[in-house]
Regions:
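Conserved donor nucleotide-binding strand/loop of the catalytic core
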Residues: 5-8, 19-53
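A conserved acidic beta->alpha catalytic loop
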Residues: 11-20, 66-67
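Solvent-exposed polar/charged
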Residues: 27, 52, 78, 82, ...
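Conserved beta-strand scaffold positions in the cores of enzyme catalytic domains, especially
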Residues: 34, 86, 158-160
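Acceptor/aglycone-binding surface of glycosyltransferases and processive sugar-polymer synthases
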Residues: 37-39, 43-53, 58, 70-145, ...
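Hydrophobic helical membrane-anchoring modules
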Residues: 146-286
Length: 286
C-alpha cells in the first residue's frame, strides 16, 4: 500500500456490546485504536475530539452508521494529493426520509443566507482534513466546536466531492427535536449576527410606527371626538403582538448568551474513560 494508516474509533458511551467488539478488534490489530467516553458528549464534540487525536498526514472522519460511504476515501485522497488541504464530501441526494432531507436543505440555505462566514450546503463534516488544518483545530481550543462552520471560516485551500447519502445501515438515530434545535442554534449563534440585528431593527421600526400611530390616533380623536372610538380590542392585540416579539428576541439573545457562557466555562470537549492502543508519547488533546 502507498500509505500507512490508523483507524480510530471514539465510542460515545454506547449501551450495547460495541465496546466488547472494539476491544476484540483492537487486540487483533494495533493500528486500530479506540477511545471510550465517560458519557455521551453529543454529536459534535465527540467526533471533533476524535479528529484531534489522530496522528496521520490527513484525517477522514466517518460516521459509524455508514451514511458516510467509505467508497469515497480514494477520491478524497486523490484530491488531497492534488494539493487541497480540505476535501468536503457534499450530499446531492439522500435516501433518508424525504421530509427530513427537505427540512435540512431549507436549514442549510437559511444559514448560508444569514451567515457572515461562508457555509457549505449539505456538508455534514464528512471529508478529508490535512494535518495542518487539524493542528489549527487543536490550537483553537473551542469547547463547543461546529466543524462545518470552522471549515468555511479558516480559509484553507478546499474542494468538494459530491455523493448520494445512503440509508442508515443499522441502529436508530437518537436525534430528536431538541438535539436538532440545539445543532441549529449552535450554527446560528456561532456564525450569524442577524438575531441581534433583527431585534434592533424591529425594535426601532416598532417604536417609530408606535409614534406615528399615536399621532394619527390623537388627530383623529380631536377631529371626530364623539364618533371616533377605537375600542379595547386593537389595543389588546397590539400589546399581545409586541409582547410576543419581546419574548422572541429575549429568547434569541438568551441563545447567544448561552453560547458565550459555554465558551467562557471552557469545559473539556469530552472526558475519557479509557483509550486503547495509544502510545504513551501520544499526547491527549482536550
Amino acid at each position: 500500500p502507498q500509505y500507512d494508516y490508523e483507524i480510530l474509533f471514539i465510542d460515545n458511551d454506547s449501551t450495547d456490546s460495541t465496546r466488547v467488539k472494539l476491544r476484540a478488534i483492537c487486540e487483533k490489530n494495533h493500528k486500530i485504536k479506540a477511545i471510550f467516553n465517560a458519557k455521551n458528549f453529543g454529536q459534535f464534540n465527540s467526533p471533533y475530539y476524535g479528529i484531534l487525536q489522530t496522528t496521520g498526514d490527513c484525517t477522514i472522519p466517518v460516521c459509524a452508521d455508514f451514511q458516510d460511504p467509505i467508497e469515497l476515501i480514494p477520491k478524497l485522497v486523490a484530491k488531497w494529493e492534488e494539493g487541497f488541504k480540505i476535501v468536503c464530501a457534499v450530499k446531492t441526494k439522500s435516501k433518508e426520509n424525504p421530509i427530513m432531507y427537505f427540512l435540512r436543505s431549507c436549514y442549510y440555505k437559511l444559514i448560508k443566507k444569514m451567515s457572515s462566514v461562508e457555509q457549505i450546503e449539505q456538508f455534514t463534516g464528512f471529508g478529508l482534513y490535512d494535518k495542518s488544518f487539524v493542528q489549527v483545530l487543536r490550537d483553537l481550543k473551542d469547547p463547543i466546536p461546529f466543524i462545518r462552520g470552522i471549515v468555511g471560516e479558516l480559509g484553507f485551500k478546499r474542494t468538494e466531492i459530491e455523493y448520494t447519502q445512503p440509508q442508515r445501515r443499522a441502529g436508530k438515530t437518537h436525534n430528536n427535536f431538541y438535539t436538532l434545535y440545539d445543532a441549529a442554534m449552535l450554527s446560528f449563534t456561532s456564525y450569524t449576527k442577524i438575531g441581534l440585528r433583527l431585534a434592533t431593527f424591529v425594535g426601532a421600526f416598532s417604536g417609530f410606527a408606535s409614534v406615528i400611530i399615536a399621532i394619527v390616533y390623537f388627530i383623529m380623536k380631536l377631529m371626530y371626538w364623539d364618533r371616533f372610538q377605537a375600542g379595547m380590542v386593537p389595543l389588546i392585540l397590539l400589546v399581545c403582538f409586541i409582547g410576543s416579539l419581546q419574548l422572541l428576541f429575549i429568547g434569541l439573545m438568551g441563545e447567544y448568551i448561552l453560547s458565550m457562557n459555554k465558551r467562557l466555562m471552557n469545559r473539556p470537549l469530552v472526558v475519557e474513560e479509557e483509550r486503547i492502543n495509544f502510545d504513551e508519547k501520544e499526547i491527549e488533546t482536550k
